[in-house]
């Protein structure tokens, strides 16, 4: 597959990118989104727990140990799939949204919107698409730095989205 063209971040007036992160029931074909967090270019954030659809039964205790979300919590406090899809479209519609785990997040969004019977009105792209070749090796380091500076817990969707947006901002100065 050909490499995607890099879009430089060096314009000082350029808005911060919208970012998104998804926590899931595990990995693999039967996994599904359980928490979706995002940060808009103006800094507004959102986060929703997703109530699993009745046929979404896959649950990986290893993944649960990382994100700390129990299935019982989702069943009691999660929002219905259609409501989550509608809210994502309301909040993110018209934006290109960036993910540092696009290879996982894209299929999980597809699962969510397919179950909701709707389509996203935003575009999800890999965060690396924003970077020049010389910046690619620095993203992980600056992502860790962003978590430290923000003093937030990892593997919660809105925190991860905030840290990614901050890391991308830090890369502007590199």
Regions found by a protein language model. Give the residues of each.
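Acidic, Mg2+-coordinating catalytic module of metal-dependent nucleases/exonucleases
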Residues: 96-102, 107-112, 142-174
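Short, glycine/charged-enriched secondary-structure capping and boundary segments
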Residues: 32-35, 111-115
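Short, motif-level signal for alpha-helix interfacial/capping segments enriched in acidic residues
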Residues: 1-7, 135-140
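Conserved non-catalytic scaffold segment of RNase H-like nuclease domains
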Residues: 2-104, 147-151
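A short alpha->loop->secondary-structure connector
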Residues: 113-125
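Active-site-proximal helix-loop-helix substrate-binding element of RNase H-like nuclease domains
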Residues: 55-58, 64-67, 71, 125-165
């Amino acid at each position: 597959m050909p490499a995607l063209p890099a879009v430089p971040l060096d314009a000082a007036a350029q808005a911060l990118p919208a970012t998104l992160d998804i926590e899931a029931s595990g990995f693999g074909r039967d996994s599904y989104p359980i928490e979706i967090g995002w940060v808009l270019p103006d800094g507004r954030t959102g986060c929703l727990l997703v109530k699993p659809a009745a046929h979404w039964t896959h649950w990986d205790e290893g993944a649960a140990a990382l994100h700390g979300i129990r299935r019982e919590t989702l069943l009691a406090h999660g929002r219905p799939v259609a409501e989550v899809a509608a809210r994502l479209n309301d909040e993110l519609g018209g934006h290109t949204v960036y993910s540092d785990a696009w290879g996982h997040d894209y299929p999980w969004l597809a699962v969510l919107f397919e179950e909701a019977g709707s389509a996203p009105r935003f575009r999800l792209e890999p965060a690396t698409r924003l970077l020049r070749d010389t910046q690619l090796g620095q993203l992980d380091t600056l992502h860790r730095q962003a978590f430290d500076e923000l003093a937030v817990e990892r593997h919660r969707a809105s925190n991860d989205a905030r840290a990614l947006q901050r890391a991308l901002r830090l890369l502007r100065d590199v």
